Amino acid sequence: MKKSIMILLVTVLGTALIVGLAFGQMMSKYEAIAKNELAPIGYNKYIVKYTKEKNNMGETMDDINMMDTKWKAEEGMADYMKPYLEGSCANYLREVVSLVPYLFEIFVMDNQGAVVCETDKTGDYMQGDEAKWQKSFADGMGGVFVDEVEFDDGFGTDVLQISVPVMDMGKAIGAITFGVFADKVM
């Protein structure tokens, strides 16, 4: 009996160790693409330009919250959303998605967490209350945020979000979130 329990315990612990190591290696892989492949997009002159323009619009938190309420209530695509999805910034993001096989969406946020531009309509306009913006904007310091891998019913596969700062002159002025197909990351 004791021998059976010991064998079971060793098997369970060994499996947990292997799974833990594999998960750690995957997280390292995601962190590596965040830093080496995705973070440089946060320095792109067009992304910086559009983010600075949005930051200089003078939008208050009340303005952002009103837009967020309106945005969330909208079932489809409204005319007021089109500049975020059809402008030059969004077109640039779509080009990036088309060139990187593991990406399925990108959206850029300003220094308050409001949408600057995006490839697909987000569920809300205000992202500033979410970890992806908070950790990547990091009070203007900039950081990398790799979210947990989750199964997406719509895609039928595992996905995750990776967020990096939009940087200008050594300071975070916004953030970018990338939707990533977990199984396509090499």
Model-derived features: positions:
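Juxtamembrane extracytoplasmic/periplasmic/luminal helical "stalk" adjacent to the first N-terminal
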Residues: F23-A78, Y102, K184
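Conserved beta-strands of PAS-like sensory domains
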Residues: T157-M186
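Amphipathic coiled-coil signal-relay and dimerization helices
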Residues: K70, A114-T119
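Bacterial N-terminal signal peptides
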Residues: L9-I18
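Bacterial N-terminal signal peptides that target proteins for export
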Residues: M1-L9
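Short, small/polar residue-rich loop motifs at catalytic or cofactor-binding pockets
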Residues: V100-L103, D158-L160
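Short hydrophobic alpha-helical segments used for membrane anchoring or interfacial signaling
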Residues: E105-N111
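Extracytoplasmic/periplasmic sensor domains and loops in membrane signaling proteins
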Residues: A78-L93, D120-E150
